Amino acid sequence: RAIFNLMAAVRRNCNEVNAMKIIKAKSYQDLSRKAANLISAQVILKPECVLGLATGSTPIGTYRQLVEWYQKDDVDFSRVTTFNLDEYVGLSPENPQSYHAFMRRNLFDHVNLAPERCHVPDGCATDLARACREYDAAIAERGGIDLQLLGIGGNGHIAFNEPGEAFEKDTHIVALKESTIRANQRFFASADQVPRQAITMGIRLIMQARKILLIAEGPAKKQALEQALFGPISAQVPAS
């Protein structure tokens, strides 16, 4: 049976391991609204919370819903801190295809998030290894991530953690698989313009979040989602 719109909310901490709630949605709009409701509830519950944010096509509707609720004074982001999962290596924040630009277009420029509280990995750092360490340190300094939003790639990747990547990694540099490059080609003029490397939070760091919200939409994600939810835990399916 195809799973067309599904949201898996996962809560993990030292006392509650592998407790998962699967929420089915009737449509993409319904999925986006339900995801936004969980995020806004986190912000209302803890106004100074730390959110982990994702890019890609799936969370766009979630961000639009959050913007709408902000404009209606239903949610206040003024004390929230955000950390994005990843960024392409070599793309400046001003590049329209960078994830810095994506977040500005879809969320940051439309709500009252303080710019100094919005963090995206620096894919143009002269010392990428140091940039990775500093990103991890910044997250730790703020007490870790309260709620992490995730999408899932067609090959089961989350963030830019590709199949085969070790789970025991924090923020690091990764070479992108050809399947990921092809999937992201639609955002660029040609496949040649898609960066071949990215800086990404690792699985270990992602799993340290107190709550994880994974959203998936469309039949193209069906196989990866089923493997992640119902298959064995494997580095070949990072989302598992």
Describe the predicted segments one by one.
Residues 75-148:
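Ligand-binding beta-strand-loop-alpha-helix segment within the catalytic cores
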Residues 143-169:
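Glycine-rich phosphate-binding loop
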Residues 159-203:
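Class I SAM-dependent methyltransferase SAM-binding "motif I" and its flanking Rossmann-like core
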Residues 3-6, 10-19:
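Short, Lys/Arg-enriched N-terminal segments with co-localized hydrophobic residues
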Residues 201-204, 208-240:
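ATP/nucleoside-binding phosphotransfer catalytic cores, i.e., glycine-rich phosphate-binding loops
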Residues 45-71:
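Glycine-rich N-terminal segment of FAD-binding domains in flavoprotein oxidoreductases
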Residues 52-56, 84, 121-122, 149-152, ...:
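Short beta-strand segments
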Residues 18-51:
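N-terminal glycine-/serine-/threonine-rich phosphate-binding loop
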